[in-house]
Design a protein with these regions (language model features):
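Short beta-strand segments within Ig-like beta-sandwich modules, predominantly Fibronectin type-III
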Residues: 50-55
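N-terminal secretory signal peptides that target proteins for export/translocation
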Residues: 1-2
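A short, sequence-level motif marking secondary-structure junctions
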Residues: 56-59, 172-174
């Protein structure tokens, strides 16, 4: 009687393992539409699965499940220089990416960007910042890199009605 119970238990465990294995083997596809820019998106599901999708390679095969975006980089070339901007969240529509079995999920990210100004004042100090928002509602960092290096802040001149420079300065990041 005990051997029979052991075989039944092993059969149930084997069927459960097989069912989980089959569920994990279903595949779907993800492709990125980043306009004329190049994109690299890192995804992670709730467990251990990670995937990296690039815009130039067509649709990439991934497991059919729900993913979360972890990092997104957009780069483009202009006059032989490579400009790059990164997104680490918040993610907008990319916060939950559902990939269905044998279907292609297209993610529209990056440009054209929406630039939203953020202005705050504390006493005599006026802080001007901006938010860079992509097509999926993803929020990018407020700075870009050029050829892999940091850029200097933009320069500004404050002039009066006659064109006289009242103050000259340079923006700084951070």
């Amino acid at each position: 009687m005990k051997k029979k119970d052991i075989f039944i238990s092993l059969g149930i465990i084997g069927a459960a393992v097989l069912a989980v294995w089959v569920c994990l083997q279903t595949k779907g596809y993800v492709q990125i539409d980043a306009g004329r820019a190049d994109a690299e998106l890192r995804l992670k599901d709730g467990w251990f699965t990670k995937a990296m999708i690039t815009s130039g390679g067509g649709a990439a095969e991934v497991g059919a499940r729900v993913f979360n975006a972890r990092r997104l980089g957009i780069s483009a070339k202009l006059n032989s220089q490579t400009w790059r901007i990164e997104c680490l969240g918040p993610w907008g529509e990319l916060s939950r990416i559902k990939v269905k079995s044998n279907e292609t999920t297209t993610l529209r990210v990056g440009p054209p960007f929406l630039i939203k100004p953020r202005i705050s004042r504390s006493g005599a100090v006026l802080a001007i910042d901006y938010a860079i928002v992509g097509r999926a509602g993803e929020l990018y960092q407020s700075f870009a890199t050029k050829d892999g290096g940091a850029m200097s802040g933009a320069k500004i001149n404050i002039v009066d009605e006659a064109g006289n420079v009242l103050h000259a300065g340079q923006f700084s990041y951070g």
